[in-house]
Design a protein with these regions (language model features):
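Non-catalytic alpha/beta scaffold blocks inside enzyme catalytic domains
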Residues: 331, 335-508
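Glycine-rich phosphate/diphosphate-binding loops that line cofactor/substrate pockets in enzymes
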Residues: 299-313, 382-392
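Long, low-complexity segments enriched in small/aliphatic residues
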Residues: 496-526
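Cofactor-/ligand-binding subdomain signature composed of acidic, glycine-rich
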Residues: 135, 245-310, 352-353, 357-365, ...
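N-terminal cofactor/phosphate-binding cores enriched in small/glycine residues
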Residues: 6, 11-76, 85-90
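Gly/Ser/Thr-rich loops at beta-strand to alpha-helix junctions
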Residues: 313-324, 400-402
């Protein structure tokens, strides 16, 4: 497809399009109902289902012919008619065949509310939708295709999206089409193959009719009954765009949010379980001082006292949001300190997992908390400073220092202060521990590995009212330390406004309305 703009006629109206653009994309862009279950922008086109048939002609003087909207491309002067009678009749006949094979168990189907068959019937007011398949057996017989994937052949419409995903995206031949006893083609695994890779659950999202099921969601609320909130995965610096699906302050699942610049329409299986990480680990929910619960003011005063010494070490990583890092930078400018910025390594897969297991290292570099050269792999240098008496205070921001080289046996005069989400060894050893919100309980931004600024939104509330965002705690610490009566940066709006006024790269960015696809900061960086 090239960038030449052309004129075409769509259902009697003159519209603009790009030369070589798929007809189905033009039709959908103009909000004209047309089902194309086998078509996906990120997969090779095939025309398997035949439900996107439309009438088209090269010139007004030509006769209409029936074409597949998912494979046919736009040419200057072309006329398209989605209501061309011959095309409509063929679409309806093919749709009727799909319904004859499809079970009417919509109330139990995990795709309810998002099923292409239901949507097509509703849009076209297809007659007899609830009667055609009345005698179809209702027993669900799942095939196990992998550790997390179940397959219900009775719901399969033969679109072959799953086959093309494995071939086009995973570059593997895992699924194929075989004949069954009813004379229909049926999806099945190749001998010796299984869907146990880290991207297999994308088939559940891809399937338009609910044939693929995530076995973990079999007995959970269906998607249409959940609230969907845009977010960003913290699994790695890729910054996969996601939707967090929740209800009643509980997260039930995470699914991919399409962004052609970052993750296309896909995500890893491991990123879908990020909310379980916080559920399965002990959460820090109380403000603690020497093992006793205390008011926030008391804990802040204890931490501020540590700012008076030049023997203070700050431990952090790219797990913090851009807002956290911005206010932290203001705090660090006021105190004498040594910063140990940790690199969190992981094994990259060459696709949606990078070698950096944190979402916002570039944000720390932008806020001048660290540089690429100063990032450390462990805390051996900090351990040496502790042993030689050069470090008497450690301020850890959501970091488990004992898993990065610091011995648990420490001098009696060493004091640890912890601000984070987990009730771990560091928080238990700390003189003061203050809980903060997770990415699911907060609104903010990350800068991914490609310097794309991306926004995440608050989905659920923290466990109690005494848990605040990390940037808010930093703002309070700054106010207490500077002993100012007028507290600043206590609202997210104030933080965003300060960022645009202080950081040149962010000067023209409206944080209140960040594009869902993000903003590429490389265009701003010199």
């Amino acid at each position: 497809m090239n960038n030449n703009r052309i004129n075409i006629i769509l259902n009697g109206k003159n519209v603009k399009a790009q030369e070589g653009e798929r007809l189905v994309e033009i039709i959908q862009r103009h909000n004209i109902p047309l089902s194309a279950p086998c078509y996906h922008r990120s997969l090779t086109e095939t025309g398997h289902c035949g439900l996107c048939l439309v009438g088209a002609r090269r010139k007004v003087t030509d006769k209409f012919s029936v074409v597949f909207a998912c494979t046919a491309t736009a040419k200057d002067g072309m006329e398209i008619d989605t209501e061309y009678k011959e095309a409509v009749d063929k679409r309806n006949e093919l749709f009727r065949l799909h319904l004859l094979r499809h079970p009417l168990d919509c109330s139990k189907c995990n795709k309810v509310g998002y099923c292409f068959l239901h949507k097509f019937a509703s849009q076209t007011r297809f007659p007899g939708f609830t009667r055609i398949a009345k005698d179809h057996p209702q027993d669900i017989k799942y095939k196990k295709f992998g550790q997390h994937i179940l397959f219900d052949a009775t719901k399969c419409i033969g679109c072959q999206r799953c086959i093309r995903f494995c071939r086009d995206v995973l570059d593997e031949e895992l699924l194929g089409l075989i004949g069954n006893e009813n004379g229909y083609g049926e999806i099945d695994l190749y001998p010796g193959k299984s869907l146990d890779n880290n991207y297999s659950l994308n088939l559940v999202d891809l399937c338009p009719a609910g044939a693929f099921v995530n076995r973990n969601y079999l007995y959970q609320p269906v998607e249409w009954n959940l609230i969907s909130t845009p977010s960003i995965s913290t699994e790695s610096s890729v910054g996969i765009n996601t939707y967090v699906l929740h209800k009643g302050n509980k997260i039930f699942r995470i699914k991919p949010r399409e962004n052609k610049y970052v993750n296309d329409a896909w995500m890893t299986n491991s990123a879908r379980n990020e909310h379980r990480y916080f559920e399965n680990r002990k959460r820090l929910t109380k403000i603690m001082q020497n093992g006793q619960q205390v008011p926030l003011e008391s804990a802040l005063l204890q931490i501020v006292e540590s700012f008076q010494t030049n023997e203070l070490a700050v431990v952090c990583s790219g797990n913090m949001s851009l807002e956290d890092q911005f206010v932290l930078r203001k705090l660090l400018d006021s105190i004498i300190h040594n910063v140990f910025f940790l690199r969190k390594k992981m094994t990259p897969d060459g696709f949606l997992i990078s070698d950096d297991a944190t979402p916002n290292v570039n944000g720390a570099i932008l806020n001048k908390i660290t540089t690429q050269e100063k990032i450390v792999d462990d805390l051996k240098e900090l351990t040496e400073k502790i042993q030689t008496g050069q470090c008497k205070r450690i301020l850890s921001f959501n970091e488990e220092i004992f898993s990065h080289g610091v011995p648990y046996a420490l001098p009696d005069d060493l004091k640890i202060f912890y601000i984070g989400t987990e009730n771990n060894k560091t928080s238990k050893r700390a003189m003061v521990a203050i809980p903060v919100t997770t990415v699911f309980e907060n609104t903010g931004t990350f800068i991914n590995r490609d310097w794309r600024l991306q926004k995440f939104h608050k989905a659920v509330n923290p466990p109690n009212g005494n848990i605040f965002p990390m940037w808010y705690i930093f703002s309070l610490l700054l106010s207490v330390y500077l002993d100012v009566s007028k507290k600043e940066l206590l609202w997210l709006d104030d933080v965003w406004k300060n960022m645009t006024h202080t950081v040149d790269v962010l000067a023209d960015i409206d944080f209140f309305h960040v594009n869902p696809g993000g903003i590429l900061l490389k265009n701003y960086l010199k």
